[in-house]
């Protein structure tokens, strides 16, 4: 009897450990559970020209994305743009939320948070979240520090809590300096995997073209384009919860919080 009880105990522990450390889909019977997912993310917006073009393209493809927006671009008190531009930017953010995209925090002034005081970091993040929530009516759950370096992320993650700090995967298109669409598309298509988080910027025409072209190719390979929120929470059926003290860069092979290579 004792031996049988011991075997049952060991088996129960094995089940629990399997659930904790291996990627388990929410529903093994659903199509989504076997369809590869990737999260396209866009920093530094919104941009009244290119963000609109991107949103139009995403809508045509039934694709979802995550936008890490700069708070200053949404603030009528900001002196960096006209009131009309601010109005248009806010309308774009409202559209993002209405169309099912995730709107996330990318600081207020796009400053280097690693060189800022804790008080400055708190202001940058809190002010931006307030502006986003004022527009969307939704809580801001995710943030990405400008620059996205591992050191910066490590510095701000505890201050940012309960927001979850999100970086990106193992490669960087550096689309802010590269204007070669074909080169960037090839980089994305050749390196993307199920659970990847891709970084681009929605304030460059070439970046928008890159994103949409890459999606067209990846879609033929069976990929579904989801928000960071959906990607990181796809294992909630196993009791998985996000930890604000970690930095999330991929969902590859259950390695949810691996820091990106620098």
Which residues does each predicted region cover?
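His/Asp/Glu-enriched short active-site or ligand-binding loop at hydrolase and phosphoryl-transfer sites
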Residues: 149-191, 223-235
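Active-site environment of divalent metal-dependent phosphoester hydrolases
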Residues: 47-49, 110-113, 149-153, 173-174, ...
């Amino acid at each position: 009897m004792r031996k049988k009880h011991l075997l049952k105990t060991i088996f129960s522990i094995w089940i629990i450990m399997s659930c904790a450390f291996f990627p388990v889909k929410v529903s093994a019977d659903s199509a989504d559970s076997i369809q590869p997912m990737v999260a396209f993310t866009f920093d530094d917006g919104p941009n009244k020209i290119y963000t609109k073009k991107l949103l139009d393209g995403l809508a045509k493809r039934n694709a979802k994305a995550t936008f890490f927006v700069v708070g200053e671009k949404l603030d009528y008190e900001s002196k960096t743009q006209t009131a009309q531009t601010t109005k248009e930017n806010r309308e774009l953010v409202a559209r993002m939320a209405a169309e099912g995209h995730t709107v996330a925090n990318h600081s207020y002034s796009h400053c280097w948070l690693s060189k800022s005081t804790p008080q400055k970091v708190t202001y940058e993040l809190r002010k931006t979240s307030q502006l986003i929530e004022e527009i969307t009516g939704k809580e801001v759950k995710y943030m990405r520090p400008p620059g996205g370096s591992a050191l910066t992320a490590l510095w701000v993650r505890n201050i940012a809590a309960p927001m979850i700090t999100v970086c990106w995967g193992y490669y960087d298109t550096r689309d802010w300096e590269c204007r070669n669409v074909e080169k960037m598309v090839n980089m994305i298509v050749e390196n993307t995997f199920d659970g990847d988080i891709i970084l681009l910027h929605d304030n460059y025409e070439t970046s928008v073209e890159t994103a949409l072209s890459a999606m067209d190719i990846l879609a033929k390979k069976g990929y579904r384009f989801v928000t960071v929120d959906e990607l990181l929470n796809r294992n909630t059926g196993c009791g998985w919860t996000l930890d604000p003290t970690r930095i999330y860069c991929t969902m590859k092979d259950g390695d949810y919080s691996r820091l990106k290579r620098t």
